[in-house]
């Protein structure tokens, strides 16, 4: 029998009160909570939950991700493994599930609904998951929900395969996550009426308010790529009485150097610091994801699993101890989640490229280019005079217009897709990556074809990774697992990433806060407005490839 007691100020989120208590834990469960007469320094509360994250974007395998985030009081995540599914299919999903089971940390996976993000007609991924694949996944007790349905056209037009995937979740009483950025109210209503119940893509408060009025649960996102907290946090007080049950917090995509400094606890601290109701904020961070996704995570009630955190500071929420299933997984600066190494899996069929492969020409007077936005995954479409790129159609550094290319890594000798992008800011050199949402082909951007070719070939040689270079220096972070993840510990991969990011900004000249993260979303054709994938420039608004 494993029996112990905790004495601390008990934060009762449900009844909105705090009082000193003695809490008894037996065999991983809360068996009693008793008020006591004492003056105590520590506070105890349920653990934090990230309500939507792609663990692969941290470059960490699930066990090493868990090792990192327990120090911030995170006890569970709602995780969509669609990044690795695009590369390795169901084998990739099983890799994530099996690795996650080697720790106490609670990761609740969904069945990816859109692999690839739209369909194989629009882009090339390493695998395709059809409705039968999804239905088989939904049968598993390891799958808790249907992951974000990004093919909004398929939902609105009632595409049979898309609707079948949604119904495979609903018929099993599992929830369906949404992904609906920039839709009109009319189309939003059609999209949500299919049975989809959440959205984490709101970037304006007006969009979020409308979706809340439809009964949609809004997940406020503050990650490494998209940062929407500043725009959406007023909802917390607006929704205090009417919609408090309808909000959650998430990181979505987060790099390890960001998570080193904080996770959901950092969002909680900001929200409380902005004056929002203390208990409402904690309800959003600790309670709402458990109730919505119906996951077995304790809420610090009698009979619950003993998943809780202890802190002395309820302003910053710096965590002193984290418990999961009654086991101490973090204390006094030390994570007790083991670091685990795995045999890599991958999917790479791409041979060395030549400079001639990156040549581009057009007879069009005006051509569309991508206009990227700092700290956002949406872009704008800009039309420019093609003479700005004449005569050789490389980059125009003076106008900050750079060549961008996608190289199919799954089907060798495919034609390279080429476009142009503004606001990236590189002055001399190139950066590249196999983290290229969501199909994860090779994406490169640079100031001339020679740099583009060199960056591409370094990535091909290593079968995946992140790369930045100029004439003097080349930096590569190897990502041997699907070209997405490393088996290195979080601190080591975070240090490598910080060095790479500093090189991109301070040496290559990019003005973006996180150039590689921004680059990775320039191929995501389900987020407005203009993106590029292995088949060409895609106008998300008109839902078609552009002739340029």
From Swiss-Prot:
CDD domains: AdeC. Pfam families: Adenine_deam_C, Amidohydro_1. It catalyses: adenine + H2O + H(+) = hypoxanthine + NH4(+). GO terms for biological process: adenine catabolic process. HAMAP family: Adenine_deamin (MF_01518). Belongs to the metallo-dependent hydrolases superfamily. Adenine deaminase family. This is Adenine deaminase. It comes from Borreliella afzelii (strain PKo) (Borrelia afzelii).
């Amino acid at each position: 029998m494993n029996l112990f007691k905790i004495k601390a100020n008990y934060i009762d989120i449900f009844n909105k009160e705090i009082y000193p208590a003695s809490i008894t834990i037996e065999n991983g469960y809360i068996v009693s909570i008793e008020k006591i007469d004492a003056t105590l320094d520590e506070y105890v509360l349920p653990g934090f939950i990230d309500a939507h994250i792609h663990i692969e974007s941290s470059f960490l395998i699930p066990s090493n991700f868990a090792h990192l985030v327990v120090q911030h009081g995170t006890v569970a995540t709602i995780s969509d493994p669609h990044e690795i599914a695009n590369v390795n299919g169901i084998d990739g999903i099983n890799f994530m599930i099996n690795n996650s089971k080697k720790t106490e940390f609670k990761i609740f996976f969904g069945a990816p609904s859109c692999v690839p993000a739209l369909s194989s007609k629009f882009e090339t991924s390493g695998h395709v998951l059809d409705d039968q694949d999804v239905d088989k996944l939904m049968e598993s007790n390891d799958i808790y929900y249907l992951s974000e349905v990004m093919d909004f056209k398929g939902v609105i037009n009632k595409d049979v395969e898309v609707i079948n995937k949604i119904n495979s979740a609903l018929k099993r009483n599992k929830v369906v996550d949404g992904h609906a950025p920039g839709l009109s109210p009319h189309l939003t209503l059609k999209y949500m009426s299919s049975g989809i119940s959440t959205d984490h893509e709101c970037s304006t408060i007006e969009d979020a308010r409308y979706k809340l009025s439809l009964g949609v649960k809004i997940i406020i996102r503050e990650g490494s790529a998209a940062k929407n907290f500043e725009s959406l946090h007023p909802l917390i007080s607006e929704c205090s009485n009417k919609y408090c049950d309808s909000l959650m917090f998430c990181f979505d995509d987060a790099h390890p150097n960001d998570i080193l400094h904080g996770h959901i606890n950092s969002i909680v601290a900001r929200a409380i610091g902005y004056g929002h109701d203390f208990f409402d904020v904690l309800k959003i961070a600790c309670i709402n994801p458990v109730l919505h996704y119906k996951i077995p995570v304790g809420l610090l009630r009698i009979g619950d699993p003993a998943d809780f955190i202890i802190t002395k500071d309820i302003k910053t929420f710096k965590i002193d101890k984290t418990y999961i299933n009654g086991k101490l997984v973090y204390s006094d600066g030390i994570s007790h989640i083991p670091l685990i190494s795995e045999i890599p899996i991958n999917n790479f069929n791409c041979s060395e490229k030549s400079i001639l492969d990156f040549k581009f020409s057009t007879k069009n007077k005006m051509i569309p280019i991508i206009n990227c936005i700092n700290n956002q995954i949406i872009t704008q479409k800009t039309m420019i005079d093609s003479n700005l790129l004449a005569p050789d159609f490389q980059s125009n550094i003076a106008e900050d217009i750079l060549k961008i290319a996608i190289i199919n890594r799954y089907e060798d000798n495919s034609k390279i897709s080429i476009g142009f992008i503004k606001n990236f800011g590189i002055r001399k050199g190139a950066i590249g990556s196999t983290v290229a949402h969501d199909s994860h082909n090779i994406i490169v951007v640079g100031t001339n074809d020679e740099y583009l070719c060199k960056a591409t070939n370094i990535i091909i040689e290593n079968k995946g990774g992140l790369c930045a270079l100029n004439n003097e220096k080349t930096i590569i972070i190897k990502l041997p697992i699907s070209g997405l993840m490393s088996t290195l510990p979080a601190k080591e991969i975070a240090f490598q990433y910080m060095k790479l990011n500093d090189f991109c900004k301070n040496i290559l000249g990019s003005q973006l806060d996180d150039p590689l993260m921004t680059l990775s979303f320039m191929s995501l054709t389900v987020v407005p407005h203009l993106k590029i994938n292995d088949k060409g420039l895609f106008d998300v608004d008109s839902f078609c490839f552009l002739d340029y």
